[in-house]
């Protein structure tokens, strides 16, 4: 198996040093008061989170021992549709008008008899609707239409 050699300069480029003029001075419009670590742990001033509704919900307290128990709230039914936030569960391919027109044009070119006779909205009783056929030696190739 051949060994691939990386092409490039023999000497690696040296990164330029950052000078005092390349970093701007603090503008005074930002205060660093909070830090979030890699594990999600946060420390510092988190009071702004409570003003924006981003705080965690309060933990439920255990009722006193002598208090009667109330029935649990009804469960919220979950929809069977995938969440739009999960791109792996939904797949949507938009070819756009130009790509779709090109593909449909190639398919129509493969059926010259279909261009002459447009099918009715409903087929007549006792007749079969026309079947789509593709010829292997069509005049237009899909790669030519889309520019490959």
Curated annotation (Swiss-Prot):
Protein name: Cdc42 effector protein 5
Topological relation to the membrane, as annotated: Peripheral membrane protein
Assembly and binders: Interacts with CDC42, in a GTP-dependent manner, and with SEPT7.
Protein's cellular compartments: Endomembrane system; Cytoplasm, Cytoskeleton
Gene designation per UniProt: CDC42EP5
Ranges of compositional bias, category Pro residues: 55-76
Occurrences of domain CRIB (ranges): 23-37
Pfam families: BORG_CEP, PBD
Residues found modified as Omega-N-methylarginine: 38
């Amino acid at each position: 198996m051949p060994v691939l050699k990386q092409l490039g300069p023999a000497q690696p480029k040296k990164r330029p040093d950052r000078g005092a003029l390349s970093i701007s001075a603090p503008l005074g419009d930002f205060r660093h008061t909070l830090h979030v670590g890699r594990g999600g742990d946060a420390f510092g001033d988190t009071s702004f989170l409570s003003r924006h509704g981003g705080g965690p919900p309060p933990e439920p307290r255990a009722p006193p021992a002598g208090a009667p128990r109330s029935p649990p709230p009804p469960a919220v039914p979950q929809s069977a549709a995938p969440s739009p936030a999960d791109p792996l569960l939904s797949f949507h391919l938009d070819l756009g008008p130009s790509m779709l027109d090109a593909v449909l044009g190639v398919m129509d070119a493969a059926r010259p008899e279909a261009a002459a006779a447009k099918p009715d909205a409903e087929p007549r009783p006792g007749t079969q609707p026309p079947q789509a056929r593709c010829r292997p030696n069509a005049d237009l190739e899909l790669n030519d239409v889309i520019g490959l």
